Amino acid sequence: MTNRIARLFPGAAGLLLVIGSAMAADTGDVKNGKLVYERYCMSCHGDQGNGQGEAAEYMSIKPRDYRQGTYKWRSTPSGSLPLDSDLEHTLFNGLYGTYMPTWKVLDERSRRDVIAYVKTFSPRFATEKPQEVIVIPPDPGYSDASVTRGAAVYLKYNCAQCHGAGGQGDGPSAHELKDDWGNQLVPYDLTKGHVKCGDQSTDIYRVFMAGLSGTPMPAFSDSLSSADAWDLVHFIQSLSPGYAKNVAGTVANNPSGDKK
């Protein structure tokens, strides 16, 4: 085909090669991604992407099984596949409180390539497309009034059942929780001052609306208003006094409430 195009349109074949290379670079190179995966990821996630690498048995929080295409951090609705940018977010930032570290040591190309390879473990990526990104409205700003309202939201949605009245992960159901693969889970301690999927206020908001797929943490997008969600974000931030103080100090110059 390429030879025929070259005869009919001199120079076009070279252009197609350039375009093809650009597309490969944009979507990631699976072959190179496999090499990156084997070097950095396989010891935990396994050679089949099943979360059963050699190191997995020593981990209290088990590595993710990639075969179902189920990921904790997503900008898409519950049940949807993540975007490539979501997977890159996890690679770049890690998941605080788990064994998933940051992989800032990897350059952008390597991250893109390993994402392309990881996606081959689940047939969902070949047959489905991610749903539209969850829209996050502007943060109205951290305030004592918002924290008070957020405490009421925390009670209304029974967050204390898992996370405990003080947010320390010691609720009545804390010892009964398991992930989709039957592994024991401990609810996150919200008083640590760091949040598993990112410290930005938008990250916390997103978790409320998207949930954490594969875990008992549900999505509240169908029942939680954006105003209540922001109040709940501010309440969660208030559980760690040092962190809340830092957030409050940024509001005047950064209305979104996000730390820069």
Please identify what each model-predicted range represents.
Residues P10-G20:
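Bacterial N-terminal signal peptides
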Residues A22-V36, F125-L155, H194, Y243-N253, ...:
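Electrostatic cytochrome c docking/interface patches
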Residues A24-D29, S43-G69, F125-S143, D189-L190:
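His/Cys-centered metal/cofactor-coordination and adjacent catalytic loops
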Residues K31-R39, T148-A160, G198-D203, A210, ...:
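Sequence context surrounding c-type heme c attachment/ligation sites in exported
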Residues N50-G51, G97-P101, Y117-V133, A145, ...:
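Inter-heme linker and motif-flanking segments adjacent to c-type heme-binding CXXCH motifs
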